[in-house]
Swiss-Prot record:
Disulfide bonds join 130-135. The active site is at residues 169, 273, 305. This is Diacylglycerol acyltransferase/mycolyltransferase Ag85A. The lineage of its organism: Bacteria, Bacillati, Actinomycetota, Actinomycetes, Mycobacteriales. Residues 1-43 form the signal peptide.
């Protein structure tokens, strides 16, 4: 409270609500940065798993994109795992922090982990993504829904349709958005601990602050000013009716900021999970009010914004993913590229 009091005293002619809101925005930005930069488990895929490190051409982004891949067998559906705000350029956070490849080995699902995309929201940006490390083109939606599935079909025998996309934190809303606009490719969307109403209220401001902290990026380069229709297009709450109409299978998880024996007992992880929970509950309410009947909503009385909980959710959803995607578990060798 001392920080808030100092700011209140320093600013005149500004309402209490605006001052506290500004401080809250700055605080959330710092917390997002702190959480996004923490690798907890350091799992990495064990030696012996059939994990490949692919370089997939992306004409839309003008470079090759690194993809970690584990085959689920010929003509298998894919499970795309999307990373958080501070996605690294060397390995996916899913591999760094969870044994996801181990869990899904021989599952009948091809596991696809795109690497990179810090602060991207896995979206097609209006402008070049310019940050502290320079400028690059972000056309992640095009890559994930056109270039990558086409390449995987041709080179790794992966089905281009009937797949799943799962994202955490930043990528939770991205996963739902990709399923909204690409329902044939993604018949299943999993969202963990995300802000599911990003265009609402302080959402654009908070996202902009977080992106600035995580790489020095600008939200306006991504979706323009907050009045731009791109913000509404990428808002799962506003577009929940499309998920219902598509009968997309959804799995939405968010804790309440209280740690359990899984861990994550630190202030940033506790605060941020509690902060985003409200938008998840609003999303469930809108889904139910719209007549949705193909979803799993898990809002336990514990859970913080950390990998221990996201890993547990990914492991828990495995049977549901296999059922929904019609995966056939296999024990034979993975097919090699053409």
């Amino acid at each position: 409270m001392q920080l808030v009091d100092r700011v209140r005293g320093a600013v005149t002619g500004m309402s209490r609500r605006l001052v506290v809101g500004a401080v809250g925005a700055a605080l959330v930005s710092g917390l997002v940065g702190a959480v996004g930069g923490t690798a907890t488990a350091g799992a990495f895929s064990r030696p012996g798993l059939p994990v490949e490190y692919l370089q997939v051409p992306s004409p839309s982004m003008g470079r090759d994109i690194k993809v970690q891949f584990q085959s689920g067998g010929a003509n298998s559906p894919a499970l795309y795992l999307l990373d958080g705000l501070r996605a690294q350029d060397d390995f996916s956070g899913w591999d760094i922090n969870t044994p996801a490849f181990e869990w899904y080995d021989q599952s009948g699902l091809s596991v696809v982990m795109p690497v990179g995309g810090q602060s991207s929201f896995y979206s097609d940006w209006y402008q070049p993504a310019c940050g502290k490390a320079g400028c690059q083109t972000y056309k992640w939606e095009t890559f994930l829904t056109s270039e990558l599935p086409g390449w995987l079909q041709a080179n790794r025998h992966v089905k281009p349709t009937g797949s799943a996309v799962v994202g955490l934190s930043m990528a939770a809303s991205s996963a739902l958005t990709l399923a909204i606009y690409h329902p044939q490719q993604f018949v299943y969307a999993g969202a963990m601990s995300g802000l599911l109403d990003p265009s609402q209220a302080m959402g654009p401001t908070l996202i902009g602050l977080a992106m600035g902290d995580a790489g020095g990026y600008k939200a306006s380069d991504m979706w323009g000013p907050k009045e731009d229709p791109a913000w509404q297009r990428n808002d799962p709450l506003l577009n929940v009716g499309k998920l219902i109409a598509n009968n997309t299978r959804v799995w939405v998880y968010c804790g309440n900021g209280k740690p359990s024996d899984l861990g994550g007992n630190n202030l940033p992880a506790k605060f941020l999970e509690g902060f985003v929970r409200t938008s998840n509950i609003k999303f469930q309410d809108a889904y139910n009010a719209g007549g949705g009947h193909n979803g799993v909503f898990d809002f336990p009385d514990s859970g913080t914004h950390s990998w221990e909980y996201w890993g547990a959710q990914l492991n828990a959803m495995k049977p549901d993913l296999q059922r929904a995607l019609g995966a056939t578990p296999n024990t034979g060798p993975a097919p090699q590229g053409a």
